Amino acid sequence: MPVTVAPDLQAIVDRIAAEMAGREERGKVADYIPGLARVDPKHFGIAVATHDGRMFAAGDADMAFSIQSVSKVFALTIALGKVGDALWKRVGREPSGNAFNSIVQLEAEQGIPRNPFINAGAIVVSDVVLAGHAPKEAIGEILRFVRDLAGDDGIVVDDEVAQGEADTGFRNAALANYMRSFGNILHPVDQVLGVYFHQCALAMSCRQLARAGRFLMHEGQHPDTGFNIVSPMRARRINALMMLCGHYDGSGEFAFRVGIPGKSGVGGGILCVVPGIASIAVWSPGLNERGNSTLGSLALERLAAATGWSVFNQREPG
């Protein structure tokens, strides 16, 4: 795919934000986590960080929100740095086809989650990150990593959201205990879940999130420091997993309509990567029936159509 940034990208982003502001159908906010239930569904933000160091943003791009499952991309990157491909003995790489918190497949597949982006898989990833750490140290490692990627020490964990998840996370506790019964969780379940809930409670703006995703646009290299966060091959494989599994059981529909790797979260955020071109973050808290941002998904579809960005596109983008 040719490396091209549309010359009128700010105008495109502004137009998309204006369209989303006028939309009536916004979906429903996640009401099972207290800290998310109170968020105004009228919010919409978008930020695009391009390969040449520019940032294009509109709407509520500087308002922090709970990134939730988008954090699984960063935790996965840390876990792969610790254990490498040995991780794939404990977590699969296939789309699930079931809800993100489903327990059904775990029994049939002997406690091995389908992929690292459903809840069960992300809990295994948290178990890997926890190795050799106290829970607070593991949480600190994730927070420092994301701050470094974004170049912003103002990123924090929302403790209220984390506590709300702990108070209501009975399904996640069931998943973790079930996997422990198969020997696929090695640390105490309460410690693993503590890391997982705090990771999901990271609060970031679209601008911060777009900056944090830039290393996946740059074949694993930190664009500010030149440091190799991951190898080019590993960056491509993380992007591939985002493409296949990044939107729960709506991943195929997202690939069909948008055509770029992405990871969504029930806080309404979506991080997308156009390899070699851009890192994109959108946020609108209203969710569709699959648990993905209604307006965020539509905005990304509009952006891909306006720019020609797609991993399936071999023509020169316009």
From Swiss-Prot:
Tell me the residue numbers annotated for binding substrate. 69, 119, 165, 172, 196, 248, 266
Superkingdom assignment: Bacteria
What GO MF annotations does this protein's record show?
Answer: glutaminase activity
Decide whether keyword Disulfide bond is in the record: no
Q: Which GO terms describe its biological process?
A: glutamate biosynthetic process; glutamine catabolic process
- EC numbers, comma separated: 3.5.1.2
Name of this protein: Glutaminase
UniProt organism field: Rhizorhabdus wittichii (strain DSM 6014 / CCUG 31198 / JCM 15750 / NBRC 105917 / EY 4224 / RW1)
* Lineage, highest ranks first: Bacteria, Pseudomonadati, Pseudomonadota, Alphaproteobacteria, Sphingomonadales
Q: Which gene encodes it?
A: glsA
